[in-house]
Regions:
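Macrodomain-like recognition of ADP-ribose-binding/processing modules
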Residues: 1-208
Length: 208
């Protein structure tokens, strides 16, 4: 069983921060941290593509080709596309390929505090559009090869997801599994959670 680092229950559902790899879990939605070319060649995105099989890479390549026909970028920062889970269909119904801010790029790094919330807002809108979702499984967006500063990013990620689960409108899902493996990110998330626990929406249910 995956290690549970944190659980917090809000008005409409629960955020659980768990260890392991995303494909070890299951839910209606798997989110992969894509790049703007949808190439499936970097970091966690490459690992998810490998688990889902060549058909996923073929699907995202076809999306890119269709976008280029109309002179549009394959998938601009903050936006997302949806594919089948292909070889992961025993665990998931849809895969959302979401492009968060790439902090290796100075222009995106400067705007990262605005771009990351917009990325999640577009993910949440897509989940509503898909419907019939109970569980969302995702690694923390932009915290891997895109080099978002972990301490800032950990707090912002918690703020965004918990705020959505505690908003007046139903979020469109009941459980968000944030799957973490990077030890530095885990350490920073634990620190910001401990320091700001009374400011986050909801109630801690880690030991429940």
């Amino acid at each position: 069983m995956a290690e549970l680092y944190m659980a917090r229950t809000c008005k409409h559902g629960v955020l659980r921060v768990v260890g392991g790899d995303p494909w070890e879990h299951s839910g209606e939605i798997l989110i992969t941290p894509a790049n703007n070319r949808l190439s499936g060649r970097e970091g966690m995105d490459a690992l998810i593509h490998a688990k889902a099989g060549q058909a996923m890479t073929d699907a995202t390549r076809n999306i890119c080709l269709e976008q280029r026909k109309v002179n549009a970028p394959p998938c601009a920062v903050t936006t997302n596309v949806v594919t089948s889970p292909f070889d992961l269909s025993d665990r998931f119904t849809h895969v959302i390929h979401a492009v968060g801010p790439d902090c290796r790029r100075p222009n995106q790094d400067e705007q990262r505090r605005e771009l990351l919330p917009e990325t999640y807002a577009n993910i949440f809108a897509r989940i509503h559009e898909l419907g019939n979702v109970r569980t969302v499984v995702a690694p923390p967006i932009s915290m891997g090869v895109f080099a978002y500063p972990h301490r800032e990013g950990a707090k912002l990620t918690l703020d965004i997801i918990l705020g959505h689960l505690d908003a007046d409108e139903h979020p469109g899902f009941e459980e968000f599994l944030l799957v973490v493996k990077d030890r530095n990110f885990i350490m920073n998330m634990r620190t910001v959670y401990r320091e700001n626990e009374d400011q986050f929406p909801g109630m801690d249910t880690t030991g429940a």
